[in-house]
Amino acid sequence: MLKQIDYQGKLEEIAEKFQGRKTEVSKEVNKTVQQIVADIQKNGDTALFNYAKKFDGYDVNTSNLLVTRMEREAGLEQIDEDYFRILRRTKSQIEEFHKHQLGNSWNIFKENGVIMGQIARPLERVALYVPGGTAAYPSTVIMNAVPALLAGVKEIIMITPVKADGKVNPNILAAAEVCGIETIYKVGGAQGVAAVAYGTESIPKVDKIVGPGNIFVATAKKICYGVVDIDMIAGPSEVLVIADKTAKPKYIAADLMAQAEHDKLASAILVTTSEKLVQQVDEELNRQVQNLERREIIESSIRNYGGAIVVKNIDDAFDVSNQLAPEHLEVLTSEPLTQLPKIKNAGSIFIGEYTPEPLGDYMSGSNHVLPTGGTAKFYSGLGVYNFIKYLTYSYYPKEVLADFKEDVETFAKSEGLTAHANSISVRFDEM
């Protein structure tokens, strides 16, 4: 199942394939989403309700758009206390990690009377998109909501599509309850994204949209970006495992498949110094996959977008990883902590054989909303800082402005901006 990749002189080619798995948006999809967004922008609730009926089969109107307290209670009754305990523990773990990301306000008081500084302010209102149906992920609710809560976002609303019965997945309701999210709208798809981006008669406009979705949701987020902020446009998931001869083959195989089961476009790559380990991992893959429900998806993704790269030494392994910039990076070597400084590009790093990537998907504390497709070279995972904006300010007394007067005027005139220069000089005309 696990093919060996010859990377000698082909690293750029490998990276291109690894990073080129993004689902291409067809002209038809893009055109359809543009029409939906324009319709919502122009016709508000009327268009929103029509699309909900057309795509989801739910006959939504102003009276049943919001999840009521009674509906929440009915859904929550289906959740046992142990699951609530797990959700609360997950939230606590995420909070403990993310509270260290809180932005700071600061100021500088100079002897000449100048005051400069930065003010950290949370976004006012954020929308969390949560996919509906059987593939609902309550962990994503917590991963997106906790950083926003810690940042101090005043209002978090949730949008999620429902089927004809109008019911929201109980696990999603439970996660929302644990996070204190009170407002849940029963709409989704591109129409839901457009509704929170532009606002309708019933749904308020937000400052930022976060959360995963299908190609229509992702395209709508991309189109609406600029009108509203978004988290990122995520592609298929990926994991890269760096391992030496001390690593356990069965652990590596299990971790590769854990990522591969997400999607047929998911990528699971092993980079190792041991050819023997590649053979052992392949044997484990073939053995373990027999008992897994998503076997077809796993085999397809590993066959088409997985593989093993054998390198001469561990430094070469990190060079490969830094070039690929994986969403998830596992380091399974004899001394993994000492090799942390070698890592330049990765969405999130999992160090040692008892820190498997799925722990990070749920309860390690780090966020699982991460850059994909090589974008970890310039993007970070979701954090508190994504829900904070920074306002800079400065105060200059007249005598200090006088000291800068000629330099600023000269600079402005060199750029042909004489009104800029005049803004400075006019303050000294009376002198």
Swiss-Prot record:
Result, substituting residue 43 to S: In strain: IL1403
Instruction: List, alphabetically, the Gene3D superfamilies matched.
Output: 1.20.5.1300, Nitrogenase molybdenum iron protein domain (3.40.50.1980)
Which residues does Zn(2+) bind? 259, 262, 361, 420
**Annotated phenotype, changing residue 295 to S:** In strain: IL1403
Cofactor annotation comment: Binds 1 zinc ion per subunit.
- As recorded in UniProt, coiled-coil segments are none
| CDD domains, sorted | Histidinol_dh
The main enzyme category here is oxidoreductase
Keywords, A to Z? Answer: Amino-acid biosynthesis, Histidine biosynthesis, Metal-binding, NAD, Oxidoreductase, Zinc
* Outcome when changing residue 38 to E: In strain: IL1403
- What protein name does the entry list? Histidinol dehydrogenase
